């Protein structure tokens, strides 16, 4: 498949193709403009992949611009996190990082231009009165008593705002458009408000800050953006986007196009709700592996490639829909099945003693790092007469469908010997503490010589060589597909979204590094935790299971 054929197709790319073919544009210039007031989530990843992906495919440019117009909610911590997330996803912005605050002088000048044209006025209604005067979806708004001030008075009052002559909330600059417009966004929207707060880029130079709708379109124009891509909630705002650019002296007039935002099952995307999860300590922070944040997904073990693939699969449309969590999980499962080396770990261990194995001895068995990729090599794993197996891999009695170890029957130990369960020891409560077996010494990685069939295979870890590991079994954060629809979304948090186990891993896991995934054979995909793991304490996070257990549960 050629590069052109491999490109995704969607309505935005069709618009770009038409613009280039008609000569409307000779190049493509997009931007990703996050507000630095929180951590990016999987929904932002869709926008990142769209904007940067288009720039890559059309040999154009994509700017990273921070929409930093509200100093009260913003922080340099979020700036650094967002930069890191964009780079981790595999994208690079054009030129230097931009900030909307870079344009504060020009934005102020354009506001003055609107005042001079009689298209903006200083309003002294309270914020509550402004909301009251705005009207509703079914009732028109009404004009502010301050709407018809003269140009000279508005210029003087706007300067008074700029120099700190008003208290916060006592005055604002509004566009003079139409209070009877069927679109509420066009009912004299606020362009500037007063905030006495230090800005992370401009310090205390300003005490008036432009609103998003005023800033966004002008920043796009100043940067020469050709296609301004937003999610559907900004569809009505396009009217204000165009109104501002139509009424100021600026040579470039970008066009805004809207696409559906990403809604994902079993999670929430609302910044307010995510913040509540963090502040009320329902999760351990913004990078908690159960969170839909990019930092949380990364810590859980998701790869950048899997997130890019997910964004490619869901596509770009104008219809809002909710994507199944299984779709995201299948992307990382396919990625790691193809690329993750294998290792053995026992999550719920029970001791198994091979009574006829030479006491005190051990040997090395060779195991492939990947069953289908010889180029990934092999490793030597120690084997001895005392091993750990998973408790679920043994039953005293079982039906024919159970293909693991059963009392009096045989099973194969992965890449090692055939063993037979002979007896067990139990504690006072009746729990099995030790399984005693015998082994066939002539079955190391080969079938029994007499031709008997041994169907089951289980994994194991040599007890004498095992590494104690903590295993964090992460699952979906909520127990229902649409937690946002619940009366109290916190009431449907999945109580088993994190289960912590103490188990054992093979010695090769000592070399594990954060961000590098393994398939724990027969268990799932895991990675070393970047927060809790130390040289003396190995902590592994489950990224995803080997199969979709939620689909099975719902059948």
Curated annotation (Swiss-Prot):
* Chain residues that bind L-glutamine: 67, 212
Annotated spans, Interaction with tRNA: 317-324
Q: Name one GO cellular component term.
A: cytosol
Chain location of the short sequence motif 'HIGH' region per the record:
34-44
| Motif annotated as 'KMSKS' region, chain positions | 268-272
Q: Which Pfam families match?
A: tRNA-synt_1c, tRNA-synt_1c_C, tRNA-synt_1c_C2
The family annotation for this protein states:
Belongs to the class-I aminoacyl-tRNA synthetase family.
Under which name does UniProt file this protein?
Answer: Glutamine--tRNA ligase
Q: Where does this protein come from, organism-wise?
A: Salmonella paratyphi B (strain ATCC BAA-1250 / SPB7)
Per the UniProt record, the lineage of the source organism begins with: Bacteria, Pseudomonadati, Pseudomonadota, Gammaproteobacteria, Enterobacterales
């Amino acid at each position: 498949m050629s590069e052109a054929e491999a490109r995704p197709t969607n309505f935005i790319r069709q618009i770009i193709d038409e613009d280039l073919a008609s000569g409307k544009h000779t190049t493509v210039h997009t931007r990703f403009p996050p507000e630095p007031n929180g951590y990016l989530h999987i929904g932002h990843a869709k926008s990142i992949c769209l904007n940067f992906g288009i720039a890559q495919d059309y040999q154009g440019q994509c700017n990273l611009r921070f929409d930093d117009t509200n100093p009260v909610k913003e922080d340099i911590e979020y700036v650094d996190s967002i930069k890191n997330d964009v780079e981790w996803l595999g994208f690079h912005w054009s030129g230097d990082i931009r900030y909307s605050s870079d344009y504060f002088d020009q934005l102020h000048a354009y506001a003055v231009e609107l005042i001079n044209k009689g298209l903006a006025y200083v309003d002294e209604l309270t914020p509550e009165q402004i909301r009251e005067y705005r009207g509703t979806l079914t009732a028109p708004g009404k004009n502010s008593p301050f709407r018809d001030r003269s140009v000279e008075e508005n210029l003087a009052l706007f300067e008074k705002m700029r120099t700190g002559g008003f208290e916060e909330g006592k005055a604002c600059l509004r566009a003079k458009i139409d209070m009877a417009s069927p679109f509420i966004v066009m009912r004299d929207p606020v362009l500037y408000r007063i905030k006495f707060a230090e800005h992370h880029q401009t310090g205390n130079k300003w005490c008036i800050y432009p609103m998003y709708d005023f800033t966004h379109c002008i920043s796009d124009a100043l940067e020469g953006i050709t296609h301004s891509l937003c999610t559907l909630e900004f569809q009505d705002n396009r009217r204000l986007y165009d109104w501002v650019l139509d009424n100021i002296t600026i040579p470039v007039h970008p066009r805004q196009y809207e696409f559906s935002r990403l809604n994902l099952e079993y999670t929430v995307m609302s910044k307010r709700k995510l913040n509540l999860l963090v502040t009320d300590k329902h999760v351990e922070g913004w990078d908690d592996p159960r969170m839909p944040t990019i930092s949380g997904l990364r810590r859980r073990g998701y790869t950048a490639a899997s997130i890019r693939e997910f964004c490619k699969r869901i596509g770009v449309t104008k219809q809002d829909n909710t994507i199944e969590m299984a779709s995201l999980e299948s992307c990382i499962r396919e990625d790691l099945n193809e690329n993750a080396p294998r290792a053995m770990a026992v999550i719920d261990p029970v001791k198994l003693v091979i009574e006829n194995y030479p006491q005190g001895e051990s040997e090395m068995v060779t195991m492939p790092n990947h069953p289908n990729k010889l180029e990934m090599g092999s490793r030597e794993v120690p084997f001895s007469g005392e091993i750990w197996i998973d408790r679920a891999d043994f039953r005293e009695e079982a039906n024919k469908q159970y293909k693991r170890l059963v009392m009096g029957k045989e099973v194969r130990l992965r890449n090692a010997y055939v063993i037979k369960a002979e007896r067990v020891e139990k504690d006072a409560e009746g729990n099995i503490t030790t399984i005693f077996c015998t082994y066939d010494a002539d079955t190391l990685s080969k079938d029994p010589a007499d031709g008997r069939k041994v169907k089951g295979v289980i994994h194991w870890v040599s007890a004498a060589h095992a590494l104690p590991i903590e295993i964090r079994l992460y699952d979906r954060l909520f127990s229902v597909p649409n937690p946002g629809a619940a009366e109290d979304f916190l009431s449907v948090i999945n109580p088993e979204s994190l289960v912590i186990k103490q188990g054992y891993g093979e010695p090769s896991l000592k070399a594990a590094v954060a961000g590098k995934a393994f398939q724990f054979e027969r268990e799932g995909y895991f990675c070393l935790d970047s927060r809790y793991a130390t040289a003396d304490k190995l902590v592994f996070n489950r990224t995803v299971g080997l199969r979709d257990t939620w689909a099975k549960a719902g059948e």
